[in-house]
UniProtKB/Swiss-Prot annotation:
Keywords in alphabetical order: Ribonucleoprotein, Ribosomal protein, RNA-binding, rRNA-binding
Entry GO terms, CC: ribonucleoprotein complex; ribosome
Top-level division of the source organism's lineage: Bacteria
UniProt-recorded name of the protein: Large ribosomal subunit protein bL20
An example Gene Ontology biological process: translation
InterPro entries referenced in this protein's UniProt entry, alphabetically: Ribosomal_bL20, RIBOSOMAL_L20_CS, Ribosomal_protein_bL20_C
Biological role: Binds directly to 23S ribosomal RNA and is necessary for the in vitro assembly process of the 50S ribosomal subunit. It is not involved in the protein synthesizing functions of that subunit.
Regions that span the bilayer: none
Family: Belongs to the bacterial ribosomal protein bL20 family.
Molecular function terms, GO-annotated: rRNA binding; structural constituent of ribosome
Organism: Hamiltonella defensa subsp. Acyrthosiphon pisum (strain 5AT)
A matching Pfam family: Ribosomal_L20
This protein's encoding gene: rplT
Keyword presence, rRNA-binding: yes
Amino acid sequence: MARVKRGVVARARHKKILKQAKGYYGARSRVYRVAVQAVTKAGQYAYRDRRQRKRQFRQLWITRINAAAREHGLSYSCLINGLKKAFIDIDRKMLADIAVFDKPSFAALAKKAKEALL
């Protein structure tokens, strides 16, 4: 059986990892062994945080909607319930955007929600 020299393959693998670790601090960007650990951990954090980002944005939207709703004498849950009863189908992202950038429109939505609750 012929001898297999893997210098080219190893070099390519090392280059790939070190390229991914570019910009890391100290040995994490220069030493292969440390870079492998750093890149692996970074990948785990990225995977986790892609999911957390969705939760955090939803949380932010709800907080903004709640603050705007309370200015109109409603709690967040009452506003959402009122909008559902009034058959106004609008997602939290758009509702939060309206609450921040278009206050008159949000006031109209809050009024409709209040009327639907009565």
